[in-house]
Swiss-Prot record:
Superkingdom per UniProt: Bacteria
Family: Belongs to the aspartate/glutamate racemases family.
A Pfam family assignment: Asp_Glu_race
SUPFAM superfamilies (alphabetical): Aspartate/glutamate racemase
Protein name, per record: Glutamate racemase
InterPro entries: Asp/Glu/hydantoin_racemase, Asp/Glu_race, Asp/Glu_racemase_AS_1, Glu_race
Function: Provides the (R)-glutamate required for cell wall biosynthesis.
Organism: Vibrio parahaemolyticus serotype O3:K6 (strain RIMD 2210633)
Species classification: Bacteria, Pseudomonadati, Pseudomonadota, Gammaproteobacteria, Vibrionales
PROSITE patterns, alphabetized: ASP_GLU_RACEMASE_1
The protein's enzyme class: isomerase
Length: 270
């Protein structure tokens, strides 16, 4: 009975990058029940038709919210956040929190320049350029879009080492140009240590994870909770994930059960 009274959080992404957001929320609020759902069948979202994306996310999230009586939804994906949040908020009766690149706090810290490391879809999206226009404080912003960094994060969670020489080559356009870098994809905090190693200790790395965690706490009105036991952690995928056994080893270290398959899509949305 006590377990059923816990607040339930759903973290959603197209891949496992949203686990970086889960970790921040869990660090602040360890006594909640956590559900993680990733739509790997349609990964990566940046290449998906917008209408298909809206339909998929709404169906998957709405089904899991209803089935598990979720109290708050976190869309831990920049692409989905910019495209799907309005319809999700219309369809759901629970709060929905999205992610945006942390341009404003980065610009307040920067003296030399800001680097935005994100996916190609994010760096070319109009919404991102509006964020830069409105919040960059006149600081120069260097844009770097990479899908390979996303793959590196996925591989790291499956026990593979991050190839530092390749990472250095990818990040080279930012070297000696910025003193603050925004990790503008939820995958990238998973390889934060490696990115820091390449860019150097003089570059400050910023992501949205802590801000999202504080927002979740505020929306759930979570004060000092009396509950001392940690909640459950369950993870679902829309299709069998690659290198599933290796992934499950990492997930177990985070307290999750092995990945379960979650199918709640119509034929037209596959």
């Amino acid at each position: 009975m006590r377990a059923s009274s816990k607040k339930k959080v759903l973290v959603f992404d197209s891949g496992v990058g949203g686990l970086s957001v889960f970790q921040e929320i869990h660090q602040l609020l360890p006594h909640l029940d956590y559900f993680y759902l990733f739509d790997n069948e349609a990964y990566p979202y940046g290449e998906l038709d917008q209408n298909v994306l809206i339909s998929r996310v709404n169906q998957l999230v709405s089904a899991l919210v209803a089935e598990h009586h979720i109290d708050i939804v976190v869309i831990a994906c920049n692409t989905a956040s910019t495209i799907v949040l309005p319809s999700l908020r219309d369809n759901l009766s629970v709060p929905v929190v999205g992610v945006v690149p942390a341009i404003k706090p980065a610009s307040l810290l920067a003296t030399q320049g800001v680097g935005l490391i994100a996916t190609p879809a994010t760096v070319t999206r109009q919404y991102t350029h509006e964020l830069i226009r409105d919040f960059a404080q006149g600081k120069p912003v260097e844009l770097l879009g990479s899908t390979r960094l996303v793959d590196m994060a996925e591989e790291k969670l499956r026990g593979e080492s991050v190839p530092l020489d390749e990472l250095k080559s990818i990040l080279s356009p930012l070297c000696n140009k910025v003193d603050v870098a925004v990790l503008g994809c939820t995958h990238f905090p998973l390889i934060k240590n490696e990115i820091q190693q390449v860019l150097g200790s003089n570059v400050v790395l910023i992501d949205s994870g802590e801000a999202i965690a504080r927002r979740v706490k505020a929306l759930l009105s979570c004060g000092e909770l009396e509950e001392k036991e940690e909640g459950i952690k369950r993870i679902f995928a829309s299709a069998p994930p690659w290198q599933e056994d290796a992934l499950n080893i990492c997930l177990a270290k985070l307290g999750f059960n092995p990945v379960q398959i979650y199918r709640h899509l119509g034929v037209s949305d596959r």
